[in-house]
């Protein structure tokens, strides 16, 4: 019996299950391709934006960063930096003291990061749902196929292949199709989740660097380093006092 003949023997419920799984598979592939395109664009534009941002951190002009932000709107790093830079520039343009706007800038960075993460995670919930439910939908079709096979045996009083082939085909195809739909969705979900974690780290780093640069926050020293420096200073003062005597 060919595969086409097996499909032809599938019952109404089994056919509905397979159609549902096929539609889920098509939607899943569409979501995966869309997320891959967006993530690749975000990564590429972020790599292009980082040299401009790095130049600003080393003493470059703020206006260069603002102009570059317009060219890299799909970059997750640029989106977060844009919120902080525009907030800071708005305070400066209004004639207020920029040094007093650190809370406004950090709040804008935090809100922008949250919004960017929501955008990056869009569609992942659907992939997770498909990955977790598709095998169970296939299992439902399997159970229905086995039931149909037993009903055929009961109706004919025999258990030949021609009697149970429809039910067995329905059971096996539903199981295979459910697993086939679930595997790409789960793999893609895990892959994109890892990408988002990396993007989150990059956005956090850029936010910290921006705040430190705008407000000239000194690097925090470890307590043991501060103690050593204080002791060295005391020793130097003592030596100078002895020398003066």
Show the residue positions of the predicted features:
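Internal alpha-helical transmembrane segments of multi-pass membrane proteins, especially GPCRs
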Residues: 8, 12, 18, 122-125, ...
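Predominantly long cytosolic amphipathic alpha-helical stalk/bundle segments
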Residues: 44-137, 148-160, 187-245
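Hydrophobic alpha-helical transmembrane segments and adjacent short intramembrane/lumenal linkers
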Residues: 157-171
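Hydrophobic alpha-helical transmembrane segments of polytopic membrane proteins
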Residues: 171-185
């Amino acid at each position: 019996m060919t595969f086409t003949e097996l499909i032809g023997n599938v019952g109404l419920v089994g056919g509905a299950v397979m159609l549902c799984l096929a539609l889920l598979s098509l939607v899943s592939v569409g979501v995966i391709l869309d997320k891959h395109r967006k993530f690749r664009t975000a990564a590429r534009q972020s790599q292009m934006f980082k040299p401009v941002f790095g130049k600003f951190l080393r003493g470059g002009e703020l206006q260069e960063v603002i102009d570059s932000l317009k060219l890299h709107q799909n970059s997750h790093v640029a989106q977060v930096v844009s919120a902080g830079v525009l907030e800071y520039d708005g305070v400066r343009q209004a004639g207020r003291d920029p040094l007093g706007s650190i809370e406004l800038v950090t709040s804008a960075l935090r809100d922008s990061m949250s919004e960017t993460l929501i955008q990056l995670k869009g569609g992942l919930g659907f992939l997770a749902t498909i990955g977790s439910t598709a095998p169970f939908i296939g299992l439902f079709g399997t159970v229905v196929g086995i039931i149909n096979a037993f009903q055929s045996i009961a109706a004919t009083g025999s258990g030949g292949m021609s009697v149970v082939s429809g039910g067995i085909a329905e059971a096996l195809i539903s199981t295979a199709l459910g697993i086939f739909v679930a595997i790409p969705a789960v793999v893609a979900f895990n892959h994109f989740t890892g990408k988002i974690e990396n993007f989150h780290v990059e956005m956090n780093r850029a936010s910290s660097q921006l705040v430190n640069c705008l407000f000239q926050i000194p690097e925090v020293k470890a307590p043991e380093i501060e103690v050593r420096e204080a002791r060295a200073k005391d020793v130097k003062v003592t030596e100078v006092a002895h020398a003066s005597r």
